[in-house]
Each structure stands twice: as structure tokens, then as C-alpha cells.
Amino acid sequence: MSVNRSSTADFDGDGRTDISVFRPSDGTWYVMQSGSNTFRAQPFGQNGDKIVPGDYDGDGRTDFAVFRQTPQNGIWYVMRSSDNSFSTVQWGLNTDKPTPGDFDGDGKTDIAVYRGGTWYVLQSSNGQSTTHQFGAPDDIPVAAANVQ
């Protein structure tokens, strides 16, 4: 049995949170857009993906994004709201916990994972990676994308 996963984010860029769910059974995001009070269905992802929405392109609208675990790695799939282009980034291991957020303060969501007390961040501002030891191996990481 598949369980829908919910997310709150500003997909339409009106400054208000939109209600959304990701339905793994059909790989579709369902969004109630607050600006126009309209419904949007966006196929993007598949069963087993972890949802990681954020403003990866810095346009003020949340982008559809998922973290997919392969046998060895973690792959990030992002659909940019600015131009509907699609990108993939291999970042992390298949056992990592995805923790996107604006860690470098540039207004764009950075790709990041948490692994046993260490944060691994791929900065959107310069493409550089940073690591931060913070937390214990069994801690649950808390990070939120900076959606403007």
C-alpha cells in the first residue's frame, strides 16, 4: 500500500503556502495553488522517491524535486519552475537523509544530505561542497528549504 506524502511550499510564487501531496503510486504531485485557487497535477517522480521540494533556481517559486536512492548513491531530480527544465545531481549515498535548505544564503535551495552526525552540503552559490559535523549518528536532521 502506497501512502501519499504531503508538503507545504509556495509553488505559484504568490508568497502564500500551497497545499500539496505527492502520490507515489503514480509519481504525481497534486497542488492546490493559493494564488489562483486552482488545482495542478504534475507528474514528477516515482514510487520510493523522497520528496525534497525547494527553490533550487531562486525564482521565488518552489521547484518539484525528489531524492532517489540507487543501489549505491542518492540522485537528486529537480524540475525548475523558472523554465521547466530538468536536472539531475548525484549527491550522497543511498543511506543518506536528504536535507535541502539555503545554507549559503543566496536565496536558492542547496542540495544537502545528513549522514551519521555529518551534514554534506553542495552550495548553489559556487558549486563547492562543505561538511559540518553536527548531531549524533541516530539524530533526525531538521532542515527546510528557504522558499521566498
Describe each model-derived feature in a short phrase.
Residues 1-148:
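Trp/Gly-enriched beta-strand/coil motifs that build multi-repeat beta-propeller-like domains
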